[in-house]
A protein has these predicted regions:
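Bacterial N-terminal signal peptides that target proteins for export
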Residues: 3-13
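C-terminal segment of classical bacterial N-terminal signal peptides
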Residues: 20-27
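Repeat-blade elements of multi-bladed beta-propeller folds
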Residues: 30-33, 59-79, 100-124, 137-164, ...
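Beta-propeller domains
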Residues: 77-88
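Short loop/turn segments that connect beta-strands within beta-propeller blades
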Residues: 86-89, 127-130, 167-171, 208-212, ...
């Protein structure tokens, strides 16, 4: 267990240079609560603290986002202070303000060795090692959702309800497409051989990556909620028609095939979390429902559940709206135990491994892991 945390104070010099000074300080020397969650409580759920860290955010600042990209954990404050941490040990890779205050950092994505962010009408490319801005291009229109790209092009959804395809090296527009119903494009996936986008009218459309040619289209009865999740040949998405869908991409030429749809008890507003064997769906006003990935059958529900934190073997770790960790057995479809997470207000959904990442608004971040 890591018994010390890194306390960092940040300064912005007149020239805009960010400087971090780092001091090691033991937990025992600090007043107040030592831990984000008590180790004694975690022991009850067969969990332990792998590391805990404190970000150098101001007293008037609060942490708002926590998410995983590759092998890094990213934390973003309401004043656009962005920290990149090694998610194995909690060490900071970089910490800096990446956009002016008041201009939200949206849709941070990793493509090869570049972080891509959207800020208003700008596409910003950031070095993931230093946090330095490599490029920034004003594309001349408001961007409605996170960017997607492949080796040749950027794919940007505009507020004008068009998907704009720009050449990657110089951001020159090559062509644009729209759906017949003129609905807003809400998410985009870019591969080398095809592009898929979803709309607020419920359309899921695949086109050629380099020309305005449609390959196939699937229409749900309600708008697509959140981004589409691609897992192998399968697409998983939630619709405001209350259904979770699995659509497979099959054959040559490529075509779509509905594998299953699962009707929930509410109008959905978030994308599902997809792991190796289970699809987890948040249902507003109800909780989190687990669905068998292969057949689309319900496994269990956690009333009041908010999101999946992680999965370990046959166990799922779900955080609830009232800040409780609930551990579910996916095989026996029953609750195993729960832990008070009263101090936890921010978390990352981890579908890659069994580590749990939690935080509070003051910038304390902890990594938990199951005890074997």
């Amino acid at each position: 267990m890591k018994m010390a945390r890194m306390l960092k104070c940040r300064f912005v010099l007149p020239a805009g240079l960010l400087v971090l000074c780092i001091v090691q300080k033991s937990f025992a020397a600090q007043g107040g609560s030592q831990w984000l969650v008590s180790p004694k409580l975690l022991k009850h759920a067969n969990l332990k603290i792998s590391w805990e860290n404190k970000l150098p955010i101001k007293k008037t600042e609060r942490l708002e986002q926590l998410f995983i990209l590759g092998n890094r954990l990213y934390a973003i404050s309401n004043q656009n202070y962005t920290a990149s941490l090694n998610r194995e040990n909690g060490n900071m890779i970089f910490g800096r303000v990446v956009a002016p205050d008041g201009l939200p950092v949206e849709g941070l994505k990793l493509y090869d060795d570049v972080l891509i962010s959207i800020a208003g009408t700008k596409v910003i490319e950031i070095d993931p090692q230093s946090g330095d801005q490599r490029k920034a291009a004003d594309v001349g229109f408001s961007i409605a959702c996170p960017a997607a790209r492949n080796s040749s092009y950027f794919y940007l959804s505009g507020a004008d309800k068009r998907l704009h395809i720009l050449r990657a090296e110089d951001k020159v527009q090559i062509f644009e497409v729209a759906v017949e119903n003129e609905s807003m494009i809400t998410s985009v996936i870019a591969e080398e051989t095809f592009v898929i986008f979803a709309t607020e009218a419920g359309n899921v459309v695949s086109i050629m990556p380099n020309m305005p040619r449609r390959l196939w289209q699937f229409d749900a009865a309600g708008g697509i909620a959140g981004p589409i999740v691609k897992d192998g040949i399968s697409l998983f998405f939630a619709s405001k028609d209350t259904n979770v869908y699995r659509v497979d991409i099959v054959g040559l030429p490529l075509r779509k095939q509905l594998a299953w749809k699962f009707q929930t008890a509410g109008v959905l507003d978030k994308a599902p979390r997809v792991t190796q064997a289970v699809v987890y769906q948040y249902v507003p006003g109800k909780g989190v429902t687990a669905i068998d990935k292969g057949g689309g059958k319900p496994l269990w529900s956690v009333p009041g559940g908010a999101d999946l934190l992680a999965e370990a073997k046959d166990k799922a770790y779900v955080i609830t709206k009232d800040r409780t960790l609930v551990v579910m057995d996916n095989i026996k479809a029953k609750k195993l135990y729960s832990v008070n997470f009263a101090e936890v207000s921010i978390y990352a959904a981890n579908i890659v491994d069994s580590k749990i990442y939690i935080a509070d608004e003051r910038g304390r971040i902890a990594c938990l892991q199951p005890v074997e």
